[in-house]
Amino acid sequence: MRKKPIIIGVTGGSGGGKTSVSRAILSNFPDQKITMIEHDSYYKDQSHLTFEERVKTNYDHPLAFDTNLMIEQLNELIEGRPVDIPVYDYTKHTRSDRTIRQEPQDVIIVEGILVLEDQRLRDLMDIKLFVDTDDDIRIIRRIKRDMEERDRSLDSIIEQYTEVVKPMYHQFIEPTKRYADIVIPEGVSNIVAIDLINTKVASILNEAK
């Protein structure tokens, strides 16, 4: 019988350090079959909308994601079958024509702002993490990321943060903290928490051998 992969959910607010925590886990297991799948890859296709309409999309609301597809593909990976993960184009605000082939792995990190919001996703996870970072730090990181990587203007980032991102965080994301097995204050700089998580993952991997 094929062993079930370990699935780790990593969530928290935008710019909170989720990706850094996920990479810290990835880097600790170089000899294992381990990968990270981002919820952001599953933003819904918006090619049927005009560019002006796409720009107004609330990307921090659960309905912005095709979570059904993510769950379907995770179940395929659990069963040992490869999947083609969608690629989202942030400059065009819609799904790209490209996909990325993902082979089954021993450890799958599922990362995103709302990965603990859907019970069906939570039920697939062995470990659930919430990265808890101060609002001021998160907005600074978001400004830097969106200007450098997503060709956004400062004004548009600040407007989106105050009108959408911050309210959605308190409405949808922060409440999922109660589902977390571990809450990590200050993200990847919390070495003790990262070490505890890596120890737990190593223990599960050893038990599965």
UniProtKB/Swiss-Prot annotation:
Pathway: Pyrimidine metabolism; CTP biosynthesis via salvage pathway; CTP from cytidine: step 1/3; Pyrimidine metabolism; UMP biosynthesis via salvage pathway; UMP from uridine: step 1/1
Domain of life, per lineage: Bacteria
Pfam hit, one: PRK
SUPFAM superfamilies, per database record: P-loop containing nucleoside triphosphate hydrolases
Class of enzymatic activity (EC top level): transferase
GO molecular function terms listed in the Swiss-Prot or TrEMBL record: ATP binding; cytidine kinase activity; uridine kinase activity
Keyword Transferase: yes
CDD domains recorded: UMPK (cd02023)
Residues spanning the membrane: none
Binding site for ATP: 12-19
Catalytic activity, reaction form: uridine + ATP = UMP + ADP + H(+); cytidine + ATP = CMP + ADP + H(+)
GO BP terms, alphabetized: CTP salvage; UMP salvage
Subcellular location: Cytoplasm
Keyword terms, alphabetized: ATP-binding, Cytoplasm, Kinase, Nucleotide-binding, Transferase
GO cellular component, one term: cytoplasm
EC number from the UniProt entry: 2.7.1.48
Signal peptide: none
Annotated NCBIfam families: PRK05480.1, udk
Family membership: Belongs to the uridine kinase family.
Name of the protein: Uridine kinase
